Amino acid sequence: DSIENVKAKIQDKEGIPPDQQRLIFAGKQLEDGRTLSDYNIQKESTLHLVLRLRGGMQIFVKTLTGKTITLEVEPSDSIENVKAKIQDKEGIPPDQQRLIFAGKQLEDGRTLSDYNIQKESTLHLVLRLRGGQ
C-alpha cells in the first residue's frame, strides 16, 4: 500500500482529508509517494497521525545540485526549525546550511513570516563548507 492509499482509508473511516494528515512512523514523516514496505512497516505496526493545521503550507528548497525538496511548514516556524527539517530529509547538519530567499540570507532566530515567505515559496540552500565562513 502507498502512503496516499493509507491516508485515503483514514479519510474513509475518520473523515479527515488527506492533505491535513501527517503520518509518522519511528519518528519519520511518511511521504505520499512511498509505500509501507519502503518504511519497513509491518503488520501490527502503529503509525501516528498528526493533523496539519490549516495554517500549514508547503515550501520548496532548491539545492545547488538542482534537487528540490518539499517541506511542510507553518508561517510561525523559525529558520532553525526549517534547517532541522532539511536535516531530517537530507542529513545536512544545520550549521552547514545557509538559506537564501529573495537574495537575502535567512537568520536562525527569525520566522518564515518575518521574511514574508508564503506557501509554495522557493528557498535556496547553499552549503557552508566546514571551516569556511
Swiss-Prot record:
Key words, A-Z: Cytoplasm, Isopeptide bond, Nucleus, Repeat, Ubl conjugation
Cross-link (Glycyl lysine isopeptide (Lys-Gly) (interchain with G-Cter in ubiquitin)): K104
Residue(s) of cross-link: Glycyl lysine isopeptide (Gly-Lys) (interchain with K-? in acceptor proteins): G132
Residue ranges occupied by any Ubiquitin-like domain in the UniProt entry: 1-56, 57-132
Entry-linked SMART domains: UBQ
Propeptide: 133
PROSITE patterns xrefs: UBIQUITIN_1, UBIQUITIN_2
Location(s), subcellular: Cytoplasm; Nucleus
One cellular component (GO) term of this entry: cytoplasm
Disulfide bond sites: none
Pfam families per record: ubiquitin
Keyword Repeat listed: yes
Record flagged with keyword NADP: no
Protein role: Ubiquitin exists either covalently attached to another protein, or free (unanchored). When covalently bound, it is conjugated to target proteins via an isopeptide bond either as a monomer (monoubiquitin), a polymer linked via different Lys residues of the ubiquitin (polyubiquitin chains) or a linear polymer linked via the initiator Met of the ubiquitin (linear polyubiquitin chains).
Something else known: For the sake of clarity sequence features are annotated only for the first chain, and are not repeated for each of the following chains.
Family membership: Belongs to the ubiquitin family.
Designated name of the protein: Polyubiquitin
Native species: Strongylocentrotus purpuratus (Purple sea urchin)
